[in-house]
From Swiss-Prot:
GO terms for biological process: DNA repair; DNA replication. The keyword Phosphoprotein does not apply. Residues 580-662 form the BRCT domain. It catalyses: NAD(+) + (deoxyribonucleotide)n-3'-hydroxyl + 5'-phospho-(deoxyribonucleotide)m = (deoxyribonucleotide)n+m + AMP + beta-nicotinamide D-nucleotide. Belongs to the NAD-dependent DNA ligase family. LigA subfamily. GO terms for cellular component: cytosol. It is an enzyme of class 6 (ligase). Its EC number is 6.5.1.2. Its cofactor is Mg(2+); Mn(2+). GO terms for molecular function: DNA ligase (NAD+) activity; metal ion binding. Keywords: DNA damage, DNA repair, DNA replication, Ligase, Magnesium, Manganese, Metal-binding, NAD, Zinc. This is DNA ligase.
Amino acid sequence: MTNLEKMREKLQDQINYHNVLYHQKNKPEISDAEYDELKKKLAEIEPEIYATQESVGAPPDERFSKVEHQEPMLSLENAYDEQGVEKFLSKIKRFLIEDKIEILCEPKIDGLSFSAIYEDGRFVKAATRGDGFVGEDVTHNVATIKGFPKFLQGVQGRLEVRGEIYISNSDFLKLNENDEFANPRNAAAGSLKQLDANITASRPLRYFAYSLIGGAEKSQSEVLNKLEALGFCVNEHQSLTSSLDGMLKFYNEVYNCRYNLDYDIDGIVYKVNDLVLQNRLGNTHKAPRSALAYKFSAVYAKTKLNKIFIQVGRTGVLTPVADLVPVNIGGVLVSRASLHNQDEIKRKDIREGDIVTIKRAGDVIPQIVEVSRDSRLPNTPEFVFPEVCPECGSKVRQVEGEAAVRCPEEFACKAQIIEKLKHFVSKDAFDIVGLGDKQIEFFYDLGLIKQIPDIFTLEERLDEFNLEEQSGWGKKSIAHLLNAIQSRRVITLDRFIFSLGIRFIGQVAAELLADYYVSYDNWYNSMIELSSDNTELVGIDGIGKKVAESLESFFSKEHNIKMLNDLTACLQILPVSSNSSNSVLNNKIIVFTGKLLAMSRGEAKVRAKTLGAKVSSHLSAKTDYLIAGEKPGSKYKKAVELGVEILDEDQWHKVISLGVFK
């Protein structure tokens, strides 16, 4: 066995060892960054093995068959202070035009979400939340949970119960005598996701049910009562209130007694109690508008800041990052923290070698909140922010009024090009299996992939670069990669727009643009004309001036136009298909003016979009309908001049309720 083979085997053994600790025992010994470094080293030695690992996937959920949720299991919007709760309550009141809304308050259990399906009262399937749309089948494992109902008396048809699986603190202490798990949540997750249901049965899993889909209940409080009547465990701590004071009072009461509970909670969940109002509020792209999680205060820990290093992102921003001595904060090993920008470093006087206090709140990136100057060594120098890009050496720039420092060489800076390529192939964009970070860097350095279109012409240039002769690459790994690329030549418009990595164009903005323009040609042609007129783009509901300016800048550069033309010659970009094709509003451009009496402007926009309409604030000859409420503005007069059809509020209600105009 050669030294290279020995090293490869050693790295593979280390990765396998840490996979077991993380995914099965839920007791990681190293940070995510250190784990990624092991995988990168293996990739350098044997890209073929690395590509295979990337396609199969290490997470344990790949071992389970998939279950598609009929209704998405969305996450909740979070608040971390009282102002966030007040904002939530004010927003739903404005949306519904209601002065008083009943809110049900419940503890937020720190466990693992589940869905259980019953057919004619018989338990038939259980699934994890997964990505919210597709979960893992854990039917046999959930069936082993003590006291979990297998049959519901008197229930007909399909009924879905949702809740949270957890392990109590007292049971966790007994289970964790050998210190196998970091915390009760990890223990619950590891126990539920076992291939052998006998192992799950040996673990003290418990659950709370909190949601019912398919019932006849009219409120969340009725849902909880029904669940309890059916034999499900329901959390006893709950409160109904119609005021902000009542919501905050419940939070404080539970916060003060949380350590007396025998299970972990990480906040309070507020839900609009009336299910009809919940339905009217609907969902954003990621969460229901009718609920909020008020997370408990952040967890803090002290550690040493080893070094400050600079990352260059795909838009050229130089971001300082703190490399820390790894510290456990609330069961999570933290080895890096965000420093945001040079102003933040100066304001807090953060220096390398300092003892710092780290704050971690929910899913927010850990931050340095305090520096222990008493512990600082004498003559410790201030951190000097670089005046040139650490990647390409170009002089950096800072736009007046912005905190961000940028490298201006977007087409020449290696770091920016590589980060754009990584973004393009990432999971939420083209999702090309086998083209991970290390592969992108390898192909860039080799000269095979220098710009995005090169990905789809890779096969034509392989002989020129003798990839098969490169260390670790063979016919099999090359074939896998080419097949993965070939399978991604068809993509939806929103994912394509997002994949380009244009500043300010995240997934939400990309989806809004795709929904409005429907096809790539429509979008492209409209963007080309931005320099002369961007009023239509700015008028799209949810698209602001910054997005418009960013798109205008992107499409003003010949390099980007050529890249798009080269790229689209290799692809099929699917137009947006509407779920409301039978709606009279499908693909119609609608503008609102004046005050609506029966519903808020926000709700009216949501209803219009649900029916397939494109909502804009800009009225033009392209507008199909102007919805005019009380005291309409200048848009009414302009609509008359342009011959745009005008609907009053009564006509608008007939459209959204009956689908007719007259």
